[in-house]
Amino acid sequence: MRNRFDRQLEELNEMLIHMGELCETAIEEATGALEGHDIARAKAVITADSEIDQMEKEIENLCLKLLLQQQPVARDLRRISASLKMITDMERIGDQTADIADIVIATKSTEEKNLKDINRMAEATVKMVRDSVSAYVQKDLELARSVMAADDEVDDLFDLVKGDLVKFISDHKGNAGDEAIDLIMIAKYLERIGDHATNIAEWVIFSITGNHPG
């Protein structure tokens, strides 16, 4: 019985890794579409969001099956419960990459000089998502805590982007100002993705220690 349960937990780990990879790719593709104003790439991000949604359903079903059929002990119960929370945040990450893609499709162009720090935000959030899922699979408390610390960097970058773009808006009128507002929205979505990665890390800590740091 325990061997079967362990195999199912391993399956859960693999599914979470795959869902995390989908989220990482979605962030990279959405910001890549922004940089090149690639409409086809942006549309592919929106399509890929449905795969993330489907992964959420499949993982949720497996977690519920484990809870109902296996009667897990406290440690395993925490891991399964944390997984259910984590996939909610990953699904929202998928939604926010689709929101970024929607903005790319709706806009005519972007001010390239404003994209450097947005790209840095994207790189930081991809790493946060990757590290949060790795921390869960490896039961790595320090890695989870490093994700939480990294959120400060993303927040600082958002403040930097917003400040630069607000100044740009005050100095320009018309379409250029509208495009700057779109970039602020994209930066805000990336900041929220960082928040979701932090939530995942907090649930990892709960799964290991039994205490939620939030």
Question: Where are the language model's segments positioned?
Answer:
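Cytosolic, long alpha-helical scaffolding segments
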Residues: 1-214
